[in-house]
Amino acid sequence: MRAVREFNVVPAVPAALAPLSELAFNLHWTWDRETQQLFESLDPGLWKSTGRDPLRLLAAISAARWAALAGNPDIVSATNAASERLRDAVEAPRWFQGRRDSPLGLVAYFSPEFGISETLPQYSGGLGILAGDHLKAASDLGVPLTAVGLLYAEGYFRQRLNADGVQEERYPPLDPLGLAMHTTDVQVTLEIAGEQVRINVWKVQVGRVPLYLLDTNVEGNSPEAAAITNRLYGGDTEHRLRQEMVLGIGGVRVLRALGLQPQVFHTNEGHAGFLSLERIRELVASGFTFREAVESVRAGGVFTTHTPVPAGIDRFSPELMKKYFGTLAASYGVTFDDLMAIGSRDDEKDGKFNMAVMGLRLAGRANGVAQLHGEVSREMFAGLWPNVPQAEVPIGAITNGVHAPTWVGDHIAPLLAKSVGPVWDGADEASWSGVGKLDPAEVWAARAKGRAELVTFVRARLGDALLDPKALTIGFARRFATYKRATLLLSQPERLRKLLLDPDRPVQFVFAGKAHPADQPGKDMIRDIELFARQLDVGHRFIFLPDYDMAVARVMYHGCDVWLNNPRRPLEACGTSGMKAALNGALNCSILDGWWDECFDGENGWAINSADDDPDTGRRDQREATSLFGLLEREIMPLYYDRGNDGLPHGWIGKMAHNWKSLGPFITAARMVRDYTTDLYEPAAAGSRLAAADDKQHQRRDPVGRLNRTGLRQRPRARAVARPVAQRARSRCSSRHLDRPVPRRQFELALGNRLVGPDARTRRRRRLFPGGGNADRRRRYRLHALIRRA
């Protein structure tokens, strides 16, 4: 059974304040400042001591305090106003409701983690935070989206450093009854290695978006089955496979049990990739062949890859796959060897099942998360399309964004509301140009308040008189992976020490982040940072903040003047932490990688010279460290400390304004979700509707014989075949620009040369996904001619 943390039963909230319970259970409060202020006003001390958790706050308020609050007309009025704002947020028409001709009905968004609030610790890092921001922006825009994830009984680990500076992990158990979620009546079962595993479902409400979390810690399951959803990214490869079966296959079954029929299934990375197999199984069970089922599934499938390195992709051995899918392959209408072929590559000789390869083959649309990452992904997966030029590999790119209301601090938000407009999140370029009219003194005062709060936070966490509230403050916070090079500054320690101890122009650094428990090199980096920070002469200006989470991140984004990012290019897929800092007025200093590669304009921050053409890793690191120190010494420090007669750094403030103007319209999650909706979701929904219309004809017969999936006889005249197929191809190009030329990918789709077709160099893959050859090229040519005439 689940270990339960101590949780106090919430006393009866007075009737006059009854909406507080609803407000606490809908995570819309996490980005509604006025609702947060309402909760704080109930008891400021308790709000702080309970970690800004409304449920814990309501549980801790005494009956006497409740009576006093119920008699306070200001509190009652604020509660009713917050309730009205929530109702408006979940019911009022938004951007999507204005798209009256949109074919989109519902998107199912799958992710292994969701970072919505530190009060719901179901995330580890960038992927989860991005997923949380995606849900929030979808709610703000009114996009019809339902999310699916796993409920981890112990979440992700809490971090502490021992006497030697070494990271240690602890996993305090969570009680779902103490979290902002509700039970549901839904329970589904899934066969895993011969055991029928029961899966319960919890519902989290994120504005108007429901998030369903799957839980195997259920009475009646074996201890092994109950432990499947124990920890995020815990356990070995086999444990990961079991989790991904629950997420992908179990997730689809949960949606069906809830009566939901999404048109579009969005898979984030390969973790949920098995959802496509479950959808294929459903269609095969209804009478489709495997190839027909693949076409139907692909029509509504969207796959987003988040890693630029093969090592970041889940791959499972044939033996492990045999153990878990050996008896299930027949339900997909194929043999086990056929099933393995879906996730295999000719250039991977170990025969492992690659989740990203399967994701790409079974999704009709795919994208990276930045323009450079899209290029890297096309190169990394080009082997799946050996006859297609790399530039035409069908993997696009939608650059990530961040949910501005979640991450912008209380000191900066009023400035943006005054200069950009009350609805500044997602505003256009013309609106953002208004930041240039802000009073420099007002801007600098807001920046100083954020920095002072960071200093106060650090001192409360670590003690002592650490940091200087007036010194140039540089932040570095992210997962400690080797390619992110957190210790790059330590490669030239004397130069670093000179920066830290400058009596007139001091610089201070704040580091935070976790290393995966199995990543020893990442742990070593944390140890090296911590040991340097413990040196008496520099420890007051160089610190490591342990137990990094969303609360720590917010304080750092609000308080740092410069955000540092120095990965090895091009290994950073996107890297959204710099976006959050930028919205708070921080200036980025980064390698031109991820989002910064496309957003740096020469004036909105600094670019570290990259030596990615140097094959010697050690020499490359030294060259890039030298470039970084040069920027700090010759540009960043002088600009920050160049003060006018009024004591203000006008050059720095001007750079902040340009930073907002150039980045504000682009780096928000509102822009990102709009792009996903118009460029991926709506075209996929149109394709899914077309496939559904075809499905209705699947069982039809006429006097001549059974019809194929386009509603035509099995051996029709050539023109009778080509015309409907051409029309189908055109309809899948774009829901907005149907008159544009049909790209190569759509020809392949229309001709039955599936996404995997060009990779079909083995006999098995040719049989599963036919395509290629002179006959196919002739058919393609005829189709092209017909489309041009149409």
Residue ranges and their predicted role:
Residues 1-790:
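Catalytic cores of carbohydrate-active enzymes across secretory and cytosolic contexts
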